[in-house]
């Protein structure tokens, strides 16, 4: 019987439970945020401005390795293209075996590059909130408002107000339903964006399959090597599909904060940023690790010359081979 769906569920739960999948990266970022904030603030957590500055400097330090990160991330596609060229050129099995080994290494380097990108983005999460508060200060100044009336009866000048003053002024607390609603919406946005992009890949792949079938039907001699396929048409479908299908997800990332701000105000937008950052960070690590593991498992199965069909527990066997490796 077909156990592919069950195997996929098992694999998702497996990689979600592995400590090295999400726990260690999240703990590393948490420790980095706390240490950078603590050291830059002079061991005083009340010094928010200097603590945020320390987090920003820590993110810049992490991004200083961008050159090496980009080089390692670009290694994977190069090795993959080399393997494709070797296969289409009809080279020997030894060449293909070596390119497959390089491609597997490329998956590891790509995962490393993704980890740096995800970690640096999460590290600047608190600085992102601070920059939004600074934009609020600029907006209030443009509107002509010069005084903030805090709930405790104290009035503070807009230019001299601290981060905490703005939180008190807009009642940014977990007991505020606007903040909580924004956090739920932000958490939803991460999963919605991933779902839209994955569906886009499926639709583009379906169009590509239809084009390949059309060429098989209409262009005689492709299967026998007597005629050349229309490669340009396939490239055109993938390029147009990639651009067209990303329009709505991109607009969603722009419209969601604006719509949330119009409905829930500043507390809702801050909650949206917090929810999107926290859920998106963990989701990004999980999907990157699970995808890389599946890819390497598939290569391990192919290397053992295992035929995947509807009656074969493909994914569970692939993960088993990966664990044995």
Where are these regions (language model features)?
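Hydrophobic packing and interface segments
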Residues: 4, 13-307, 316
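Short "domain-exit" segments at the C-terminal end of structured domains
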Residues: 308-325
């Amino acid at each position: 019987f077909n156990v592919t769906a069950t195997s996929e569920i098992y694999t998702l739960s497996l990689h979600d439970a592995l400590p090295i999948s999400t726990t260690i990266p999240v703990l590393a970022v948490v420790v980095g945020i706390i240490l950078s904030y603590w050291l830059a603030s002079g061991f005083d957590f009340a010094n928010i401005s200097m603590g945020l500055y320390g987090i920003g400097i820590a993110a810049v330090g992490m991004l200083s390795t961008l050159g090496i990160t980009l080089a390692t991330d670009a290694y994977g596609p190069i090795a993959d293209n080399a393997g494709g060229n070797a296969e289409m050129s009809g080279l020997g099995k030894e060449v293909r075996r070596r390119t497959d080994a390089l491609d597997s290494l490329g998956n590891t380097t790509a995962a490393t590059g993704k980890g740096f990108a995800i970690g640096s983005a999460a590290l600047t999460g608190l600085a992102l909130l601070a920059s939004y508060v600074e934009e609020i200060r600029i907006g209030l100044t443009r509107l002509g408002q010069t005084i903030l009336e805090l709930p405790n009866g104290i009035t503070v000048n807009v230019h001299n107000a601290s981060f905490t003053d703005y939180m008190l002024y807009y009642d940014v607390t977990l007991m505020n339903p606007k903040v909580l609603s924004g956090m739920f919406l932000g958490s939803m946005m991460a999963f919605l964006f991933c779902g839209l992009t994955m569906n886009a890949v499926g639709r583009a792949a379906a169009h590509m399959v239809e084009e390949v079938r059309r060429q098989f039907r209409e262009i005689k001699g492709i299967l026998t090597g007597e005629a050349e396929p229309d490669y340009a048409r396939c490239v055109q479908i993938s390029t147009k599909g990639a651009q067209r299908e990303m329009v709505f997800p991109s607009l969603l990332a722009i419209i969601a904060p604006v719509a949330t701000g119009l409905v829930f105000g500043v507390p809702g937008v801050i909650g949206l940023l917090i929810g999107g950052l926290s859920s998106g960070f963990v989701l990004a690590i999980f999907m990157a690790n699970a995808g890389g593991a599946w890819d390497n498992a598939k290569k391990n199965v192919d290397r053992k010359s295992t035929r995947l069909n509807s009656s074969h527990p493909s994914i569970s066997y692939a993960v088993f081979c990966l664990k044995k490796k």
